[in-house]
A protein has these predicted regions:
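C-terminal capping alpha-helices of c-type cytochrome domains
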Residues: 121-167
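Gly/Gly-Pro-rich "capping" loops immediately C-terminal to redox-active cysteine motifs
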Residues: 65-69, 83-119, 143
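Bacterial signal peptide processing site
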Residues: 21-25
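The canonical Cys-X-X-Cys-His
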Residues: 68, 72-81, 155-159
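Stable alpha-helical elements in mature extracytoplasmic
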Residues: 64, 71-74, 89, 121-124, ...
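Electrostatic cytochrome c docking/interface patches
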Residues: 38-71
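N-terminal post-signal-peptidase region of extra-cytosolic proteins
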Residues: 56-61, 76-80, 107-114
Length: 167
């Protein structure tokens, strides 16, 4: 038992050291934002997601949301989806549909995207995900694109359902 005491002491000191590394975020504040963020909406229920998807045009209405979620795993390293979420390498995607390109305040977009005049509708999002550098030459987005129309439809349906407030 006495051999365990040094390990326990080291574990406690490590936990205390890690706890002191950063200031925890307070209510409505994110640690990396430097300020207050809007309160996020509660996650959508499966029924709310199904209702949102039922309102989408084809091929998004019949797209596989689970497949879209799996495809989003590629996007997750650069983008967040939740309301009030942080921008990372790429901007937060909450509220994308219907917004003008380069709409996230404070995100460092390329001049090409800022001046593109694009609005994020289904057709534009499809072209963007297929070949972003072809749609907007000079974009900073390093993603090479997604060839499969079925995969793009699944991803776009997932993004639309998960970046739109519940009704």
């Amino acid at each position: 038992m006495s051999a365990d005491r040094p390990l326990i002491a080291i574990a406690i000191m490590a936990a205390i050291s890690l706890a002191a590394c950063g200031k925890p975020a307070t209510d409505g504040e994110t640690a990396d934002s430097g300020g207050v963020q809007p309160a996020a909406s509660p996650p959508l229920t499966d029924a709310q997601k199904a209702a949102l998807q039922a309102e989408l045009p084809e091929p998004y209405r019949s797209a596989d949301l689970e497949k879209g979620e799996a495809l989003y795993a590629m996007c997750r390293s650069c983008h967040t989806l939740v309301e009030g979420g942080a921008s990372m390498t790429g901007p937060n995607l909450w509220g994308t549909f219907g917004a003008k390109a380069a709409y996230v305040t404070g995100f460092n977009y390329s001049d090409a995207l800022k001046t593109s005049g694009l609005t994020w509708d289904f057709a534009t999002m499809d072209k963007w995900i297929e070949k972003p550098r072809e749609l907007v030459p000079g974009t900073k987005m390093s993603y090479v694109g997604m060839k499969s129309p079925e995969d793009r439809a699944a991803l776009i349906a997932f993004l639309k359902v998960n970046t739109t407030p519940a009704k």
